[in-house]
């Protein structure tokens, strides 16, 4: 095997002739073995669970309080949702919202200010009710058709309208206008603001709540919205205890997958790959943070780490001949195929087959082996997709945009990650749920498209510099004869419309339960987190480092 320099690049061994390899020189891990040393104190974990009982009951009573004003009730539910506590009171919240939605009267909103209207709109839309966007009509000037100048003096209201606009659907031009208008206005005043309002506006402009990672958004909410939280003392108390409880559980999960990764010795056998265990765990945590999904997170993290090894082998080390052999071996999925692949990748291949076999064996006992098979088939699909990309690169071929997207939706890794996320979710992922996934519904297509194009828009220059296969940006330019800026603008419009389709799919009546839709929505959110401003996975020193520090390194809030 080739020697490795300190900077991570491979050099040809002087004693043997090494093939020319497309080395990427990925940055090393930011974290090293930091998370291996964590030791879970179960007494502390149980202490937080017990301490949550009293404030949880107090918050439950507030939610069901029949004497509370409806706007105050919706404001309370809004804070509960922003704090990541909805799942603790799901039945109570749904009952309250069902009742309030049935009582909805557009004329009532004539009396509400912009902030109240926005909060109510967000609560209903976030939790599945299609409150009409007509509630914002009164804030537009009837003669000019634009938003009234007077609302520019209400920064809190404009912030609420900006967040509301992220929940828009196709055919809601007032919210398209609201998004552009409020973004411009908020950017013009943000540097004049002070205190928590300044933090709230900066946070929202950087990434609106609806596009954010739920755990991080919850952590920042009780830091930046203490006034909203402090109306009811039990709410911030519960939120902080809840965060601390989850933090302990999740640090233990991160320790488990970090130890597994180290024991598998991938950094020794395939040292050219990106060492990104905490980043992958963070990515999966973004799909579901609730305690009941602990096993699911561990399983999905391991499978996604397999994907990193595969991706970097195809993209940053293997020759085209080696890629063809490895793809064939993955298609065969048989230990006897190990003899045909290069020696450096054999340990990975064996571990891959062994881990999937063990998963299938364990879930077969529960009658749920089909979810493992679906994940395995998605893994085989992506290997074939990576081969297609490699063949294009090898021949210098730039695919047409439709051709690129057909393969690119596979190589985005969305299908592998989303199906692997189902494996450990338990009884809710039965044959009907898998059949729904396999039908490739519109909501899934939209999230998948975001996964592909958000990545392309952010990474196309880096990929060009490395001489890798053309991205969606390059294919769009070639196919439609547009400039680079025009291509990026068009891809961003496609991303924007895909978000509208996801929003529509999460409204009642839903095709499947929100338990199944949430990972789809959240995977789109995590793509935004990782790729909005940079390639946060390849170069994790900014956003992902900040988020990992906030959730696993920084001190807990109590």
From Swiss-Prot:
Q: Which reaction does it catalyse?
A: (2E,6E)-farnesyl diphosphate = (+)-(R)-germacrene A + diphosphate
Pfam families on file: Terpene_synth (PF01397), Terpene_synth_C (PF03936)
Which top-level enzyme class is recorded in the Swiss-Prot or TrEMBL entry? lyase
Sorted alphabetically, which SUPFAM superfamilies does this protein's record hold? Terpenoid cyclases/Protein prenyltransferases, Terpenoid synthases
Single GO molecular-function term?
A: germacrene-A synthase activity
Listed EC numbers: 4.2.3.23
Provide the residue positions that the database annotates as binding Mg(2+) 2: 311, 315
Cystine bridges: which residues?
none
Keywords noted in UniProt? Lyase, Magnesium, Metal-binding
Can you cite a GO biological process for this protein? farnesyl diphosphate metabolic process
Tell what the record comments on domains: The Asp-Asp-Xaa-Xaa-Asp/Glu (DDXXD/E) motif is important for the catalytic activity, presumably through binding to Mg(2+).
Q: What does this protein do?
A: Involved in sesquiterpene lactone biosynthesis. Produces exclusively (+)-germacrene A.
> What is the recorded name of this protein?
Germacrene A synthase short form
Task: Please tell me the species this chain comes from.
Answer: Cichorium intybus
């Amino acid at each position: 095997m080739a020697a490795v320099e300190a900077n991570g690049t491979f050099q040809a061994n002087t004693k043997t002739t090494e093939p020319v390899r497309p080395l990427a020189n990925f940055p090393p891990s930011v974290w090293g073995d930091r998370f291996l040393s964590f030791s879970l104190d179960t007494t502390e974990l149980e202490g937080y669970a017990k301490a949550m009982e009293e404030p949880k009951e107090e918050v439950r009573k507030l939610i069901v309080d029949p004497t509370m004003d409806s706007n105050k009730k919706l404001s309370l539910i809004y804070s509960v949702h922003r704090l990541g506590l909805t799942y603790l009171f799901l039945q109570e919240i749904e009952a309250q919202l069902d009742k309030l939605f049935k009582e909805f009267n557009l004329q009532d909103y004539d009396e509400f200010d912009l902030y109240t209207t926005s909060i109510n709109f967000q609560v209903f839309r976030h939790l599945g009710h299609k409150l009409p966007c007509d509630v914002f009509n009164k804030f537009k000037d009837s003669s000019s058709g634009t938003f009234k100048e007077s609302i520019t003096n209400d920064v809190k209201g404009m912030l609420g309208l900006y967040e509301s606009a992220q929940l828009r659907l196709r055919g809601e031009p007032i919210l398209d206008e609201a998004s552009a208008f409020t973004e411009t206005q908020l950017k013009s005043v943000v540097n004049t603001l002070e205190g928590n309002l300044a933090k709230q506006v900066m946070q929202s402009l950087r990434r609106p709540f609806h596009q954010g990672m739920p755990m991080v958004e919850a952590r920042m909410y009780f830091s930046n919205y203490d006034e909203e939280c402090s109306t009811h003392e039990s709410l911030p108390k519960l939120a902080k205890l809840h965060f601390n409880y989850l933090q302990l559980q999740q640090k233990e999960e991160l320790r488990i997958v970090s130890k597994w990764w180290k024991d598998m010795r991938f950094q020794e056998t395939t040292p050219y790959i990106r060492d990104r265990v905490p980043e992958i765990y963070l990515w999966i945590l973004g799909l579901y943070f609730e305690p009941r999904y602990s096993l699911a997170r561990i399983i999905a993290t391991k499978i996604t780490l397999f994907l990193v090894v595969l991706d970097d082998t195809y993209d940053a080390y293997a020759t085209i001949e080696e890629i063809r052999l490895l793809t064939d071996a993955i298609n065969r999925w048989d230990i006897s195929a190990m003899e045909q692949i290069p020696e450096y990748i054999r340990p990975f291949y064996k571990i891959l087959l062994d881990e999937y076999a063990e998963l299938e064996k364990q879930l077969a006992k529960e009658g749920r082996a089909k979810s493992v098979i679906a994940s395995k088939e998605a893994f085989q699909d992506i290997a074939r997709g990576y081969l297609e990309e490699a063949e294009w690169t090898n021949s210098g071929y730039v695919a047409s945009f439709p051709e690129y997207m057909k393969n690119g939706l596979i190589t985005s890794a969305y299908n592998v990650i989303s199906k692997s996320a189902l494996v450990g979710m338990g009884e809710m992922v039965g044959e009907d749920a898998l059949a729904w996934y396999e039908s490739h519904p519109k909501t899934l297509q939209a999230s998948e498209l975001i996964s592909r194009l958000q990545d392309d828009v952010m990474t196309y220059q880096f990929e060009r510099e490395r001489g890798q296969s053309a991205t969606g940006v390059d294919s769009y330019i070639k196919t439609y004869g547009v400039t680079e800026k025009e291509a990026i603008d068009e891809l961003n419009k496609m991303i924007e419309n895909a978000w509208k389709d996801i929003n529509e799919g999460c409204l009642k009546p839903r095709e499947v339960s929100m338990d199944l839709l949430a990972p789809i929505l959240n995977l789109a959110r995590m793509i935004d987190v990782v790729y909005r401003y940079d390639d946060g996975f390849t170069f994790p020193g900014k956003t992902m480092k900040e988020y990992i520090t906030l959730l696993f390194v920084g001190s807990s809030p109590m």
